[in-house]
Structures are given as structure tokens and as C-alpha cells.
């Protein structure tokens, strides 16, 4: 992991948000799904950031009794909406596709319309699975979101987001391996991206002129088996039959390059730096535990480096 003491986001004068007297009228963001895994970290990240701490951040979440399906045009106008409220579970979507369609598609229509009519910048959660949207109902809802979104919005295709120290969602493989509750492995390869890097990417996208679909990952895939081996759990049984799931997912992060963003965490390094990590001599035989797997920092000419 790298920790460089530099600005997380560009200074305000470099932003594309409308310029105005912020004391009279501060910038205003709306974050839906603010109590979810990504949403909670994002709101905290923005509130601590030296630039975004000056913004007014409104939140909306079902856990606070606020259903996105009941969204109506507010009295105040937002400068940007970050829509993270959605069901995200492949297996449950296979069991109840109608419920996922209602929540992820139908309930989002009012919010999308609000942004379109008022020309408000919209960043919404899509999924890496939307590329092969036909594999499961969850991915289908994310693909439909991409189709129905306003033309000047950003569909953020999140890859496998994780956070160490038992802070990921309970149903995420990374946390299951931390807790030693995983019962099987698969042969899948996934692009694991740290929650801090996700928040930094969103912070960069808010003021940018980028639109369309944007992959938010590291650009490197790691197999489930390799990750399990790093956790000393490579001997778990392999499940071959995994309906609805793609074999490999890996982000193309080139569209984020103009923002100066790059990933700063590597999932295998995160495991080795885990408080409960113990050296695995079998894993070291592949020269994987003696060498740093930190991602190389790309040269961003004319761009600031990130923390």
C-alpha cells in the first residue's frame, strides 16, 4: 500500500463544477445508498477530504426509512448525484429476478429523470457483470441502468470491491476468507479493488467531463484460488458449477487516466499486511510472498499523484 502526502483531488479552481460564491451557495451532492458498503465509506471519505469537506452532502438510504422509489424532486438543486442504492447479489437475483428489476430499475427511474430534466451530473453504480449482462438478472438490471441513464452521466462499473480488517460485506469472499467461513472456492479470476481506491476514483469523476461507462478496478485479475492460498485456505474444495457467473473479470481503467487516478492497493499485498496474517511458506514457493506486488504508479504527465 502506498501513502503519499499529496492532494486526493484537484483544487477547486481546476474543477468543472459551476463557479460561484461557495459561502453564499455551497456545492451540493446527493448520495443514495449512503448506509451501504461503498456509500458509507464514500460519505466519510468526502467529508474528510480537504476539498469536498466544503460541500453539503445529502444522503438517502432505505436503512433510514428513505426508499429510492419514493424519490421526488427536492426543493434544493444538487450539483451532482451519486446513485449507489441497489440490490447487488448474483445468486439472489437468480432466485428472485422480479424483485431485483423492481428495485434496481423501476425505482431508479425518478432519480434518473430528476438528473436529466435538471441537467445534474449523475454518477451511478453499474457492475463489471454488465459486460455479460445476459448471465444473470442482477447484471441485466445494471445493463438496463446504463441504457436508461441520461446521456451526460457516468456508469461506474465496479469490480470486486473489498476492505480488509473484517470490514467488507458479510457475503463477500474476501471477508469470508478473513473469517475462515468460506466453504468452497471457484476457478474464477476477479479484479479486486480496495474501497479507498474506489472512493478516490469517484472523487475524481465528480468534477470531470468524463461521461459514459467507466471501469473501476485495478486492471489486474487475481484468481480466487490464489487469493485463498494467500489466506492459507487454498485446500478448500473447488466448486465447478457456478451458474450466472463469468469466468474472468478485469477492468480497463484507461478511461480514468485523464483524471490522474490510479489504483494504490494490490489485493495480495493487502492480505500480507493484514493484522492476522501469518507467513505461508507454501505460497512463497511461487515467489509471491517475498516480492512486493504493489501496483506500479503510472507516469501521469502534468497530473498530481494521489494518496
Regions found by a protein language model. Name each.
Residues 109-139, 154:
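Conserved Rossmann-fold NAD(P)-dependent oxidoreductase catalytic core, especially the SDR/UDP-sugar
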Residues 53-73:
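Adenosine-cofactor binding site in Rossmann-like domains, unifying the SAM/SAH pocket
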Residues 72-103, 129:
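NAD(P)H-binding glycine-rich loop region in Rossmannoid oxidoreductase-like domains
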Residues 135-139, 143-199, 203-204, 230-232:
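NAD(P)-dependent short-chain dehydrogenase/reductase
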Residues 81, 95-122:
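NAD(P)-cofactor binding segment of oxidoreductase domains
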Residues 185-187, 213-214, 222-229, 233-254:
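C-terminal "lid/loop" region of Rossmann-like NAD(P)-dependent oxidoreductases
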Residues 27-48:
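N-terminal Rossmann NAD(P)H-binding glycine-rich loop of SDR-like oxidoreductase domains
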Residues 2-20, 25, 267-307:
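Amphipathic terminal alpha-helices
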